[in-house]
Amino acid sequence: MAKLLIIDTALEEAIVALSKDGKIIAELTNKETHSHANFIQVAIAQLLATQKLDIKEIDAIAVTLGPGSYTGLRVGLASAKGIAYTLQKPLIGLSTLSALAFTAIKLVPKKMEQPFQIFSMIDARRMEIFGAIYDAVCNPILPEQAIVLDESKWNSLIHQPTICIGNGITKTKEIKVAQKVIYLDAMYTSQELVEMAMIKWNAGHFEDLAYVGPNYLKEVYIIPSK
């Protein structure tokens, strides 16, 4: 069965993990946002050593493409592409918003009113979020996009009972809405990432190394150093 290397540096906490047969067998995390780049290589070496694996035994590399931290996305994808290219292994791209929806489905109250939708949201500073809406089986309803939240916009998106998940939910709790809303104070874990990655692995859905890039959802402005 497939052995995967999972790299996630999209958000504040970075994750590097190894999986086998769709289950996490080892992982390391790093909460120091500014050191994610150094953490990745050190973590990979440590995990391979503890599992007595050679990196050539890895069947594919899975990496979060975003949305999330611009810098985090760049360093994570650069590392993943470098490994995939060197080893000639497939690269699997993962969405952070889809991962949140995948997580929400596991946490949905059993008596949740049907039908319902899942609103994944990641903090994008000020009153803006990166968001997407999914149905009860993770099919997209509203495509991933940057959203400026206000009462009018919020109510235009909530047409039915809604489960909100992600670190952007704090921006919505005080906004009045007509529909029932449940807030899940949760984030995805490495296990959700590997389960999503295995779906793509089994389907043969891999990224083209020449063209894949971070999914920023917003234009990136880089200020030249003086």
Summary of predicted features, one role per range:
Residues 47-51, 86, 104, 190-201:
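Stable alpha-helical structural segments in soluble proteins, enriched in small hydrophobic residues
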Residues 60-96:
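DPxDG-like acidic metal-binding loop motif
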Residues 23, 90-186, 216, 221-222:
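Surface "functional belts" at beta-alpha junctions
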Residues 31-39, 70, 74, 78, ...:
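Residues at secondary-structure transition points
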Residues 1-65:
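N-terminal beta-alpha supersecondary unit
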Residues 183-226:
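Acyltransferase
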